[in-house]
Structure formats: C-alpha cells, structure tokens
Amino acid sequence: MSNFQAALDAYKNGDLIIVTDDANRENEGDLMLLAEKATTEKVAFMVRHTTGILCVAMTQERARALNLPLMVEVNQDSKKTAFTVSVDYKPGLTTGVSAQ
C-alpha cells in the first residue's frame, strides 16, 4: 500500500493526518480531519498542537448561505487564500477558542 493510500484510508476512518504542500508554496503541513468524524478530543488536539486556527473548506455558495463574507474585500495575499470572517461561537462558552 502506498503512503498516499494509507493516509487516505486513515482520513476516511476519522484519523488525523498531516498534508504537506510544496516548498515553493507555503512549505508547511496542515493537520486535517474529516469534519463528520470530528470529536471534542480530536479538535482539542488540533487546537493544542497547531496555531489554534481551524479552517473548514466550503464552496462560495455555502459561505454565502451561512452569511460568511470574505475577511478582506481586496485580497493582497500572494497565495490568494480566500478566508472568510472568523467564527467561534457556542452558547454558554465565554473563554474564546473551544474544542466543543
């Protein structure tokens, strides 16, 4: 089995995987998890062992349906990463970032 296939199988099973990009892009790794397999424990691990910024991939249509505008109107980032405004909300929580 190839490393790619092993990672894909682990991802489908709900395991955390690290995906790295090219040295000519950001030269970094992203800790990824299939959203439907997320648990409080896995999200807490991601928050603790990364920058704490969690991203969710979605289509432009879905972002619009959720009323999530782009973070900036004129994207000057060299990679043109299309971040929306940040969301961190759960009723009853008052401490900021939470894995719940």
Language model regions located:
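Catalytic domains of riboflavin
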Residues: 1-100
